[in-house]
Amino acid sequence: MNSEGRSGGRPTGNSSDSASGDALHYPKVVLVTGACRFLGGYLTARLAQNPLINHVIAVDAIAPSKDLLRRMGRAEFVRADIRNPFIAKVIRNGDVDTVVHAAAASYAPRSGGRATLKELNVMGAIQLFAACQKAPSVRRVILKSTSEVYGSNPHDPVLFTEDTSARRPPGEGFARDSIDIEGYARGLARRRPDIAVTILRLANMIGPAMDTALSRFLAGPVVPTVFGRDARLQLLHEQDALGALERATMAGKAGTFNIGASGIIMMSQAIRRSGRIPLPVPRSAMWAVDSLRRATRYTEVDREQLNYLSYGRVMDTTRMRKELGYSPKWTTVEAFDDYVRGRGLTPIIDPRWVRSMESRAVSAAQRWGS
């Protein structure tokens, strides 16, 4: 996994928590779940390099590769399934004061289906938060959540704020799991008001190293789109996602925060910029087209993902900048272009020609309008 390039995000310097005691109380012992996944692994490596942190404990149910273990540096790896009560012993014996829960998965494991995934996600979170509640040393819990909790609907607001409810709450898949997990995290905050619970709703992530449903969907030579729809996409560069998690871990700012890049990209623009060929199909036919793409290894689209590809989703990130004090380095368009470059996608249609035609069209429209 290549993580070269700009390190993700930066503090804005105008956070309202900068003068508070929370900003001065850095974590001493941090436990990171999902440490063998992209975000958990790289976050562990970053935190292990921070001299302000005394100890980092990386937890996952599978053993890390030699390369990942080397990248974790001085962090201690503990092989544990967070669904097992053993996680409480790890937290208690390690005198952990900060827990970063980054283990929730959006795709089903090879063995088992949707039911297994839900158990991994929801039951794992329940057991972990119960362990945090019982551990007097725990003072911070950071939850990696997702913008998918808002769903996607043709009647959605232009921007989702953290206080906006979904018009039609997701009823299945990773989005439903994330809604449930957030609920358990808020329950922990009510039962232990001395714990600062931070929930980060990450926009759809993309980048050269991270494998996501969206990156696989856009990697095929032909990209099916819903006829008559052009989704508005707000993205988040993989390095900015890491930066936001790191910022939340160090800042200890309680609350729920939308995390996304500035600007949007339309689905049609994304397809053109990557040199793919769009294939408009009726919404009802997307399932059949996806079955063919699945056979050629590109992706699998569930109901919530189909809604996202039809309508998109954009969040208001004012609270992220002003209260969390974090600002992503990559805009949505820059994040997408970095994904295209980093993946080495061979254009079916030269994007430079497409952009040239777009520029000429804009110039012509301006001349006609003047």
Task: For every predicted segment, state its role.
Residues 242-304, 317, 336-337, 346-360, ...:
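Mid/C-terminal beta-alpha module of Rossmann-like enzyme folds, strongest
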Residues 27-50:
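N-terminal Rossmann NAD(P)H-binding glycine-rich loop of SDR-like oxidoreductase domains
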Residues 126-174:
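Conserved Rossmann-fold NAD(P)-dependent oxidoreductase catalytic core, especially the SDR/UDP-sugar
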Residues 177-180, 210-213, 226-250, 255:
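Substrate-positioning beta->alpha
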Residues 76-123, 134, 152:
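NAD(P)H-binding glycine-rich loop region in Rossmannoid oxidoreductase-like domains
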Residues 149-150, 173, 195-216:
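Flexible, glycine-rich beta-alpha linker
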